[in-house]
């Protein structure tokens, strides 16, 4: 007797199953099952993955779900019911049932809906905890019989079954079900109620249940859970040996269930054109209109290219798609929403350019349409659009309103139990302390996709910890079993689907955000179904551009059209050449700054190339690219015929489009064929490489190139196929970078205001940008209750600090402050508390405003303001309570105010600490400032100077603001530090050998005199600390000195005069010794020749006398 599992939960029943879909189907195949069902709780998240996996193994997929169903319209109680799709109609009804359960009626399905969606569905009671089972266990047999017949009347005879599960040990219930079946004539079927795959996975399942409940295993009641594994046929035959008809019923049900999900077809929606015009004709009309708008009277190249692209688009039936995108982009522009110049290969389309979907002229920038839409490789077009992250939702709302709520949805994504999360979660339910679980998780290398098995192999320390503890070994073992399972559902950052038919005919939906549904299928499975997917991306840099340009327009009455700026502007490229790129899209990293300083870019083309090259692999070509640009290395072309293709990149292959053009030029490939070649060779499979080599060489020979030349060029194509970057994307994103650089170069104050406002809430970034602003000469004004706004603002040639950037001052409080001061400025603390609504004024907020300096203008010291808070609040409360009566007698000139509670100002160290706490930065001063003269005398440089002197040994005076100690793989301690001074912040690292010596002085808040050097690591400047001592322990005898050796050949009046001039130009506190080689004599120079021993003076002396002849000795 055969059997089919009809009640199966996968990991998509979130935290209620330890069975991954692929593994579930693989095990069913191994056990020889011909059919298998999937019946997750309320959802169909895994349906397509399950369907494909079953089809791939020749198993009949039975798609179902477990629905909660209300017993009546009162909606008081809902009970589970297993529903299986018999047919495509049944599958579509399941889509609707799941959508209802996940959006309109999360508690359960109303009887009327169950009746509406019953067609094509087989229903099975769950075996326990269902409505029928609950009635039977309550002794209500007759009611159970009545309810059973009602269910049968809904689904039809032969489409409603009782689940019979004797293996769960409830003998009384099992006998009652058999009796009920006999009395009602409704058949029983065997079901397994699968929640995990193998019996040894039971502990993992119990663990998941505890994670879901937020309990520890020791707290949960000890349940004698039945085995809920995917039992083999032999075991099921043994369980049901006395009732083989139940096994047979499962097979009969499976034979009825035949669903055919259409995969691979395209479901492009149609665009509602005016007057019934065809989409092809309408697209042509608006493209011609756009071409004239862009170019006036375009030349023949543009007309030919446009006609070619339109022909391809029409032939591939994508006219509606372009019209849909054109329409919502048009709406965005009409609403003043900034849109990106393009993203990905879409920037290579002239149609997209003339429709104002992109802002990149593909002919001017040598971009290829075939890289976007290849007529020789049919695939869905993919236009990703960037919007400001604050306005992206407006565009999605427009699309939903135009096409209807049931035709537009955002896309689901799943957070999984990755290695670290699995270890932490399992550790918690096993009672491992959070600290220990965290320490264990931190031993897992931080790399995307890292598995627990890989982590144990790569981390000897993790392996050691696990071997030392049987409890941790158990935690690890179970974490491995649940690793990779979905933990929660969330919304994809960008994806939106659009459908001609109601989405619930194709995909189950669930509640989303802002009234927009969320698909239950993830992106890959939506593509399998042929749904049109578009990416609406929120780009912070566009928000920044929008913010800066609107400020300039509002304050300066200058409307900036970034589409018409010069991409060779001297001021812009001077800024870029200095590496002054903080806040500049994709050009901010330390490594990129270094490249820009060496490259000295002179136009957009250089930035495009750098963005394309600055990646692992292509990076190795950057030095050659720079040397060729500046004429320090000859430009070599693989063949002279390739000069026009490679001359912009000085003979270096940088872009995928160059590979395509080379194949077209030399081998006569169409650009479509060239794109196929590029894709093929990038896979690096030998048989494909050999086949394509023959194809390429054959084409070259037809065009009379030699075999050697053809092979040489093909080898280059193979080498760069993986390295080559999408030029269309590089051009578009480089334009955003150049636009921001233009704004920074020409409107630095507005740029800095916009940049600072964009990172409100991120203390580290605000701190970094404020230090940079001060370093570049921009004055930052303190926060002020009378002058500050929500954003950072420009005020009299300076930047005024934002109120919202003060900790504990929320959005509503800022609004209330702004509204209250509109009539007149606040006069004092009492006036402030009286006029700002009491819902916003509380002690915490007032303390934050006072500590930050936002109330300094009231003319009292901060300690006095703090001491007067209670009086001010009581005064405001008293007058607010009597406001109606007092208002009859008070006028503007009459006021009763209490007096300040005057007290001495707080010590400077406390004032600064409170400033740092509320602003994230030492604003008015820095704790180190009191030591600056002493530090300079000791030869210490600032953090800003140190960051500009990479790889040089330096001394610094710093405040240690953060310390993070870790253990290396070999079990040694080391530390990562955050250091600061008046000029900025910097990360530092203390390796194990140094940590052993320095750990006594490494504590947060310590003021240190330290030595080491800066290095660029992982694209960040990091200080490698070699020595450190507390500033308070500094010894005057350790004062540094500069030793200058004057070789015999240098002993001349001219050289001595130059030395004297350099010393006098860099006066300071560091002593200078001269050693005359000829006389073998050392002379200590008088104080009048003491210098500020920074890297600038040392560089000048070394340049004059030689590297080895100038030494700064310290410690």
From Swiss-Prot:
SUPFAM superfamilies: PHP domain-like
The UniProt record lists the keyword Lyase: no
Pfam family name, one: tRNA_anti-codon
CDD domains named among the record's database cross-references: DnaE_OBF
Location, primary (coarse class): cytoplasm
Catalyzed reactions: DNA(n) + a 2'-deoxyribonucleoside 5'-triphosphate = DNA(n+1) + diphosphate
Localization, UniProt: Cytoplasm, Nucleoid
Coiled-coil regions listed in the entry: none
Recorded superkingdom: Bacteria
Gene Ontology MF terms in the entry: 3'-5' exonuclease activity; DNA-directed DNA polymerase activity; nucleic acid binding
EC number: 2.7.7.7
GO CC annotation: cytoplasm; nucleoid
EC class (word): transferase
Keywords: Cytoplasm, DNA replication, DNA-directed DNA polymerase, Nucleotidyltransferase, Transferase
InterPro entries tied to this protein: DNA_pol3_alpha_NTPase_dom, DNA_pol3_alpha_thumb_dom, DNA_pol3_finger, DnaE2/DnaE/PolC, DNAPol_HHH, NA-bd_OB_tRNA, PHP_dom, Pol/His_phosphatase_N
Subunit architecture: DNA polymerase III contains a core (composed of alpha, epsilon and theta chains) that associates with a tau subunit. This core dimerizes to form the PolIII' complex. PolIII' associates with the gamma complex (composed of gamma, delta, delta', psi and chi chains) and with the beta chain to form the complete DNA polymerase III complex. Interacts with SSB (sbbA) via the latter's 6 C-terminal residues.
Family to which the UniProt record says this protein belongs: Belongs to the DNA polymerase type-C family. DnaE subfamily.
Function recorded in the entry: DNA polymerase III is a complex, multichain enzyme responsible for most of the replicative synthesis in bacteria. This DNA polymerase also exhibits 3' to 5' exonuclease activity. The alpha chain is the DNA polymerase.
Protein name per Swiss-Prot or TrEMBL: DNA polymerase III subunit alpha
UniProt organism field: Bacillus subtilis (strain 168)
Source species taxonomy: Bacteria, Bacillati, Bacillota, Bacilli, Bacillales
């Amino acid at each position: 007797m055969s059997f089919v599992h009809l009640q199966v939960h996968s990991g998509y029943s979130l935290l209620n199953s330890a069975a991954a879909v692929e593994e579930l189907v693989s095990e069913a195949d191994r056990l020889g099952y011909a059919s298998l069902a999937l019946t997750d709780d309320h959802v169909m998240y895994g349906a397509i993955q399950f369907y494909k996996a079953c089809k791939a193994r020749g198993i009949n997929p039975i798609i179902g779900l477990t629905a909660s169903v209300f017993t009546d319209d009162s909606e008081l109680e809902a009970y589970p019911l297993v529903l299986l799709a018999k047919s495509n109609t049944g599958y579509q009804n399941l889509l609707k049932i799941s959508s209802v359960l996940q959006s309109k009626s999360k508690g359960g399905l109303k009887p009327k809906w169950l009746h509406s969606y019953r067609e094509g569905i087989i229903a099975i009671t769950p075996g326990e905890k269902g409505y029928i089972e609950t009635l039977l266990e309550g002794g209500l047999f007759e009611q159970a019989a009545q309810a059973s017949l009602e269910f049968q009347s809904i689904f039809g005879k032969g489409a409603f079954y009782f689940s019979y599960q004797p293996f769960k040990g409830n003998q009384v219930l099992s006998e009652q079900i058999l009796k009920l079946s006999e009395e009602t004539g409704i058949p029983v079927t065997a079901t397994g109620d699968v929640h995990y795959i193998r019996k040894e996975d039971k502990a993992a399942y119990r663990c998941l249940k505890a994670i879901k409940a937020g309990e520890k295993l020791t707290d949960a009641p000890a349940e004698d859970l039945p085995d809920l594994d995917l039992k083999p046929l032999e075991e099921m035959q043994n369980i049901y040996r006395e009732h083989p008809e139940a096994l047979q019923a499962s097979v009969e049900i499976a034979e009825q269930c035949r669903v055919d999900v259409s995969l691979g077809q395209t479901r492009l929606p149609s665009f509602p054109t005016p007057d019934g015009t065809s989409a092809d004709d309408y697209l042509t009309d608006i493209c011609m209109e756009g071409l004239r708008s862009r170019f006036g009277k375009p030349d023949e190249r543009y007309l030919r290219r446009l006609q070619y692209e339109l022909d391809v688009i029409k032939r591939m039936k994508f006219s509606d798609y372009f019209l849909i995108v054109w329409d919502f982009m048009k709406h965005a522009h009409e609403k003043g929403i900034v849109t990106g110049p393009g993203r990905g290969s879409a920037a290579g389309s002239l149609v997209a350019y003339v429709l104002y979907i992109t802002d990149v002229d593909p002919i001017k920038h040598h971009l290829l349409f075939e890289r976007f839409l290849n007529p020789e490789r049919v695939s869905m077009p993919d236009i990703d659009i960037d919007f400001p992250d604050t306005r992206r939702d407006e565009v999605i709302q427009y699309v939903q309103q135009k096409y209807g709520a049931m035709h537009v949805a955002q896309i689901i994504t799943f957070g999984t139990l990755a290695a670290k999360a699995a270890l932490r979660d399992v550790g918690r339910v096993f009672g491992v302390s959070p600290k220990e679980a965290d320490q264990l998780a931190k031993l897992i290398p931080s790399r995307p996709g890292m598995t627990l098995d890989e982590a144990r192999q790569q981390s000897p320390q993790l392996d050691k910890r696990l071997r030392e503890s049987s409890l941790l070994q158990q935690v690890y073992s179970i974490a491995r079993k649940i690793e990779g399972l979905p933990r929660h559902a969330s919304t994809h950052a960008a994806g939106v689907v659009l459908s001609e038919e109601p989405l619930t005919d194709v995909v189950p939906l669930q509640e989303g955000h802002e009234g927009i549904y969320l698909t239950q299928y993830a992106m890959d499975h939506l593509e399998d179904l042929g749904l049109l997917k578009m990416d609406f991306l929120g780009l912070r840099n566009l928000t920044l551009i929008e913010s800066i340009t609107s400020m300039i327009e509002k304050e300066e009455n200058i409307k900036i059209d970034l589409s018409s700026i010069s991409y060779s502007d001297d001021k812009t490229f001077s800024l870029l050449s200095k590496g002054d790129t903080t806040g500049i899209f994709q050009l901010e990293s330390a490594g990129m700054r270094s490249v820009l300083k060496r490259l000295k870019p002179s136009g957009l083309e250089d930035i495009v190339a750098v963005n394309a090259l600055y990646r692992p692999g292509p990076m190795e070509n950057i030095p050659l690219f720079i040397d060729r640009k500046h004429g320090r290395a000859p430009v070599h072309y693989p063949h002279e015929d390739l000069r026009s293709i490679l001359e912009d990149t000085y003979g270096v292959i940088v872009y995928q489009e160059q590979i395509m053009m080379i194949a077209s030029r030399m081998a006569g490939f169409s650009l479509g064929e060239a794109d196929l070649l590029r894709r093929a060779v990038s896979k690096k499979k030998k048989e494909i490489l050999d086949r394509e080599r023959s194809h390429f060489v054959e084409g070259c020979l037809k065009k009379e190139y030699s075999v050697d030349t053809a092979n040489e060029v093909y080898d280059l194509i193979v080498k760069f196929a993986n390295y080559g970057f999408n030029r269309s994307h590089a051009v578009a994103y480089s334009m955003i970078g150049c636009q921001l650089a233009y704004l920074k170069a020409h409107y630095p104050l507005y740029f800095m205001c916009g940049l600072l406002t964009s990172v409100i809430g991120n203390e580290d970034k605000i701190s970094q940008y404020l230090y940079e602003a001060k370093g570049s000469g921009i004055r930052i004004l303190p926060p002020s209750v009378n002058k500050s706004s929500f954003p950072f603002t420009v005020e009299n040639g300076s930047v005024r600090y934002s109120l919202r950037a003060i900790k504990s001052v929320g959005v509503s409080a800022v609004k209330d402050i702004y509204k209250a001061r509109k009539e007149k400025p606040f006069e004092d603390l009492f006036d402030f508390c009286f006029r700002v609504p009491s819902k916003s004024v509380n002690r915490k907020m007032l303390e934050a405003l006072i500590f930050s300096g936002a109330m300094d203008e009231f003319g009292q010291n901060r300690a006095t303001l703090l001491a007067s808070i209670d009086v001010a609040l009581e005064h405001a409360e008293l007058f607010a309570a009597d406001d109606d009566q007092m208002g009859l007698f008070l006028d503007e000139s009459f006021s009763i105010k209490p007096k300040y509670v005057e007290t001495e100002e707080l010590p400077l160290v406390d004032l600064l600490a409170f400033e740092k706490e509320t602003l994230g930065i030492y604003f008015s001063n820095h704790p180190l400032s009191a030591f600056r003269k002493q530090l300079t005398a000791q030869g210490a440089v600032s953090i800003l100077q140190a960051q500009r002197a990479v790889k040089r040994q330096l001394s610094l005076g710093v405040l240690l603001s953060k310390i993070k100690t870790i253990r290396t793989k070999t079990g040694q301690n080391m530390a990562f530090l955050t250091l600061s001074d008046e000029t900025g912040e910097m990360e530092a690292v203390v390796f194990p050998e140094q940590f052993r010596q320095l750990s006594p002085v490494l504590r947060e808040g310590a003021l240190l005199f330290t030595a080491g050097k800066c290095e660029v690591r992982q694209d960040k400047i990091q200080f490698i600390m070699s020595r450190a001592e507390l500033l308070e322990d500094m010894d005057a005898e350790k004062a540094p000195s500069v030793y200058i050796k004057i070789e015999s050949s240098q002993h001349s009046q001219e050289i001595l005069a130059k030395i004297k001039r350099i010393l006098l130009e860099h006066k300071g506190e560091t002593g200078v010794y001269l050693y005359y080689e000829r006389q073998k004599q050392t002379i200590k120079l008088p104080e009048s020749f003491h210098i500020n021993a920074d890297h600038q003076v040392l560089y000048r002396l070394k340049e004059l006398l030689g590297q080895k002849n100038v030494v700064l000795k310290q410690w």
